[in-house]
């Protein structure tokens, strides 16, 4: 499975998360996943909620349209973005 998969209702992203980074950013490809750096620490779900908020801004969707499908407690996650309004260039480059 590739890092980015296009479905009828949106995108599925396989992510590798780097918490406690100096800034929020989509870093690029990391193995077969997209690496995302976020500033929030991995404590009490702070990193997950920060990730959902960050991806919502990047794809211009509501937070409710960013769904963590797998990996709630780990660095490796599968995220679904429902009907993205925009696709960041770092992700667009990975779509086959």
UniProtKB/Swiss-Prot annotation:
Instruction: Return the GO cellular component terms, semicolon-separated.
Output: cytoplasm
| InterPro entries reported for this sequence | DUF167 (IPR003746), YggU-like_sf (IPR036591)
Enumerate the Pfam families for this protein: DUF167
> Could you name the domain of life of the organism this protein comes from?
Bacteria
Protein family according to the UniProt entry: Belongs to the UPF0235 family.
User: Which NCBIfam families does this chain map to?
Assistant: DUF167 family protein, PRK05090.1
- What protein name does the entry list? UPF0235 protein YggU
Species whose genome carries this gene:
Escherichia coli O157:H7
